[in-house]
Structures are given as C-alpha cells and as structure tokens.
C-alpha cells in the first residue's frame, strides 16, 4: 500500500462545525480562521453571529483544526469555549468569510487595546501611508468598546460608520493576507478621522508650559509637562485646588524606568495591551514634587493611542537627553464624569485648558484609564475601566440576569448574563446630575451590547443612596445587599470560592443592618446565607461625614474611647475645634459610632501628626502608608473578646509618645494591625471550620496592610483571597451585589419548587 493511499484511509474527509464563544469579535478572529483553514487546505466558511463566531471546515485535516484554533488564536481574543459538531461532508474547494448574522447577542466585544508594534512602526515610517496618522489601527489594536453601539461588532455598529473607507483601505479590508483584513476601525488620512491641531503645535504649547485638553480613546486628558512646577500648580488651581495624585504618561518602558523603579510584575502591566496606569516606586528628583505630594509611589502609564506616541516622539526630539513625561489626568472638572464630547469640552474645559484638541471620531461611551498596582505579587485594580471593560468575570454557574447599581462612591454597575458578570467602567461619585446621567448611559449601553433584559436588581441597603434610587427606578424585583457583605461577596465571586467563607470587610463606611456605620467586620458567607460574626471595637463618629474629611476629629474620638481625652490638648495645642469637641464629649449629647477601619486609620494618622484635614478621600491613610519602612507589632497592642477586635491599646501607645516620628508610628500601626487582624480572622475561621478567608474593602488597597495580612494568614495555615478582578474599594461593590443576590434568588426559586413538589 502506498503512503498516499494509507493516508487517505486513515484521514477521511470530515466536516466540522465549530461554535466559538468569548471575546472573539473585533479581534481579527475571522481572518485568523481564514488563514488557518487555507494553510491546512480546508474548505468552508467563518462568520460572526449573535453567539460568537461560527466556523465550518471540511477536509482531511479537519480534526486538527479545533486545537489549532485554541492554541493559535489572535492576541486579543479570549476563548471561553469551542463546541464541535460533526456534519455530513458537503464538498467545496474554497474557504470564505461570510457576512455577519444578527439576532440576540450572546457574545461580547473586546476591550480597547493599545497601539501594536506593527502600527507603531508604520507611524514612524515615511514610506507608509499611515506615517504620522493619529488614528492608525489594525485587528490587533485600537478602539473597540468605546466606539461600539451594538453587536455584532461590524463597522456599521460603531462610530466609524460615518467614515466610508477609501479604495486603498477597502482593499486592505478584504485582503486575507493584510493585517487590516476585516479590521472594522481601519482608516487612513484619506478617509478617516482627523485631529483638530497639528502635533507640532500641541508639542510646542506643552513645552511652553501650557495645559492641553486632548481627546483620546475614552475621553479627554488634561496634559502638561511633568517636570514643570508652574504648569502643574496652575493645573491644580484650575481644577478647583484638586490635590489628588496625578498620573504621568511616558513613551515606553525605558522612559518609565528612568522615572521610577517598576518590578517585573509592574512592567508586565505597563506594557500589556490594556496599558493601565500602574502605581510604582518613584525615583527621587525625576518628576515634579507636585505630582503626588506626600506619596512615594507614582502612577505611570505608557502611551497607548497613536496620538500619544506622536506627541511624545515630538517632545523627545526637543529633549534628546531626557525622556519626555506628561501629566495625564482625567478631564473631569468639579469631580463630574470624564468629558468625552467635543461640544461638552468646548463648554467645560476652556476654563482649565489653554488649548483644547479634538477629533471627529465620536466616543460612544466614555471610559477612564484603568488604575492598578501589584499587591502580594499579583495585579490588583484601583479603578477598572479602559482596556478591561467589558471583559467578564466568570461566576462559575448559570443564573438569572441581575443588574446591580453599586455604591454611591466610585460607582460602577454590573449586569450578569448566564454564568458571566459584566462590571462596567468607572462612573464615579453619584453626587451630581452629570454622574447620574452617565450612570444611565452606562446601563443602557451595557444592556445593549450584551443584549440582556435583567430580571432582578440588586442594590445597597442605605436608604439615602442615589444608587438605590436608580435600582428602584428600573421597575424590577429588588434584592438589597448589605455593603460589607457585597465587598466580601465580590472576592468570593472573583476567586470562585464555595462553602463557608470567612470575610474581612475593611473600609471607610457602609450602612449596617443595625443602622450604624460599619467598616471593620467579619462576615461569614455560605451560599445564600450570611452572618456578621465580629467587628472592630466601635469608635465615636463626631459630626458624621465631617469626621471622614477631618481626621483630627477621629483622633479626639479615639482618645475618648481609650479613656485619655485629656491628651488631646497636648497633641493639638491651640486647636479650637479640639477644645470644642472635647467639651462635647464631656456633655451628655449622644454621638453615633463606627466600627470602620478607615476611620481608625484617620485617627492614627492625626495622632501621629501626619494629616489633620484631608483634601481627598483616603489621603491621610495613603500618606501614613507611604511612611512605612518595616511594619512591627506592638506587644499588647490589641485584644480580642466576644468577636470584637480592640485596638485602643495601640491608639493609646501612639498618643502617649507625645508626637512620635511619623515613620515609627506608621511601622507600629501597620504591624499591629496586621497581627491583630490575622489573629482575629484565624479565631473566626477555626470556629467555623473553614480555611478560606476573603479580604475585601477599600483598606485592601493599602499594599502594606493587604500583603502583610495575606502573608500572616498563610503563616497561620489559612487561604487568603485578595480582590483581583474588581477593585477592593467601592468600585467592586457592583460585582458582589449580583453575585450574592443570585444565590438568594436561586435559593428562593428552589424552595418554591420544593414546596410545589411536596404539595
């Protein structure tokens, strides 16, 4: 028998249908399948439809095709599943890309991706028609989520629909060997979007100390020279005295290394297609001290859009011995959502920026830059937005579709579909009308691109939250989920934990089931059941929300709780507010209380003299963390009894030092917190027969505390889980709400079915 005859006997012609689900539209999947099928001499077709990508292939090597798809998929593709069905061979010699089919969407689009190496080379190649073109893209990079109105992901459903392709781009689009084969946003200077100002003019204005508002992928940035104190000071002044840390954009990883000391994990994040802002250790003297006052870490990001590359290239030519660096902060005047519309920018940014640079490609839905850091050796979100949305979180099981409206601070929303949870981009504080409008836009857009009609709504317990009003306005059955339960449930969903899980919910404030302010809780979750199993020793909360803005108030309150309010005048001599507050505590007027770890941080920072008044949320705790050298535990610095963890001995120790060195106080405070929380969790876990400990809440953004606590728990034989797929702060609440609500809904449904059966 000849080898060719043997091969024909062993490998008969087969026809297979592949249903590919996941982030497989808008990432070059169809041209990839086309080229792969041609290389394997297979006939058939590929198309996008409402369920993902459908492929039919026929030939002698058809059985090898599914594995090749799985292992060789395009870099931006995320394959969730490949279902294979064998069909009767139909013949044919060609493999074709067919038009997309409509219908209900059960797939998703990819996130926006940073400029790839190929497009980056074309930007600087005088022989390329994309030379110097600020909107170059291909199947491996460019905007996706922020330009898409609906699925399937085709040009007609994006903001590129208003830019008909020129003859050359159209030829690239239909050429299977071209990197822009079926790249929906493909465009060139002859047919695509245009920038309102030349790159050289923008660069010259920045070099001259100007503030520039630049429209990018998900909205406008406010830019200025990161080494110019005058420009940065003016930017802060024009942003109504905003003192929050600014992010810095640089051209490449070499520039990042000049300004900071990123470790391997941080560099991997910096160069990833998502291009988030990454918090890294700053090098002294390389940047203006006005960028991140009082902090030792700086938020860096690499250029991710062609316009960024062109601008930083031009600036670098002017300073060849010094890497160009730009402050790049969100254009969100007055704390309102990010500006993304040209007309809106003309109204709202002219008082801040000396130059407003626009382009004519509409941003369908705005998205801030994502912000990340590395905690305990792995990435963690501070803000999840551009580059990651709308990638889902796998909940591990099917369930009803739930929409969650999140918290009132750092608001996000979440929609579940099947076994997936889709957390929205960062919306922000719901304390203004523009934010409420943005939240409605996000809800409508996310439900549209997912083609989902939620069956239930989940929201916070707080009776005055605007996010609760949003849920009530959806006219759906509502499942309320307590704030700290949601923090822990988010980590449970994130790490796919099951069975009883002991959670530590550590944050600034959340409305408790008893009507008091919680924020330092042990929460035990077992599917649809939960219990508050412990809390920090409550402290007085004088003047309510003012205590969160003025840490000195919490300092006085902590001394009152420790029985040494007499130390207050010594720590803050001549402070009239301290005198008044001390007198108030001496009276009979009742004061609300809080078990919040965030407020305990404020108290300690004030007692240590780090900060008495905050310019932004979390400032005192962030500056206190920045002082830590080596955490150490104070012997006898805490006690545990009846599920309550009491740090009053630690507070008393700090106060009795008079005014200790800030670094000494930070070391002792963080070290004692870590030891106390670890012991507290270990006792609680042992009492409930579990080793799983979920660590949630905004305090878990403190790298020293989170990493130290995770390490201490592992040393005690426990299995800690930190937030990874959603922020630890209130930006992750919207993931925990539907994750827990679905457990409640499915349990109630099961109970109803059981009762019907028994009847």
UniProtKB/Swiss-Prot annotation:
Family of this protein: Belongs to the carbamoyltransferase HypF family.
YrdC-like domain span: 196-387
InterPro entries, sorted: Acylphosphatase-like_dom, Acylphosphatase-like_dom_sf, Acylphosphatase_CS, Carbamoyltrans_HypF-like, Carbamoyltransferase_HypF, DHBP_synth_RibB-like_a/b_dom, HypF_C, HypF_C_2
Reaction(s) the record says it catalyses: C-terminal L-cysteinyl-[HypE protein] + carbamoyl phosphate + ATP + H2O = C-terminal S-carboxamide-L-cysteinyl-[HypE protein] + AMP + phosphate + diphosphate + H(+)
Pathway(s) where this gene product acts: Protein modification; [NiFe] hydrogenase maturation
Function field: Involved in the maturation of [NiFe] hydrogenases. Along with HypE, it catalyzes the synthesis of the CN ligands of the active site iron of [NiFe]-hydrogenases. HypF functions as a carbamoyl transferase using carbamoylphosphate as a substrate and transferring the carboxamido moiety in an ATP-dependent reaction to the thiolate of the C-terminal cysteine of HypE yielding a protein-S-carboxamide.
Documented EC number(s): 6.2.-.-
Superkingdom of source: Bacteria
Metal-binding recorded as keyword: yes
PROSITE patterns xref list: ACYLPHOSPHATASE_1, ACYLPHOSPHATASE_3, YRDC
Protein name (database record): Carbamoyltransferase HypF
Root EC class: ligase
Gene3D superfamilies hit by this protein: 3.30.110.120, 3.30.420.360, 3.30.420.40, 3.90.870.50
Domain Acylphosphatase-like: 15-99
GO terms for biological process, alphabetical: protein maturation
GO molecular function, one term: zinc ion binding
NCBIfam families, alphabetized: hypF
UniProt zinc finger (C4-type) residues: 116-141, 166-191
Organism field: Rhizobium leguminosarum bv. viciae
Keywords: Ligase, Metal-binding, Zinc, Zinc-finger
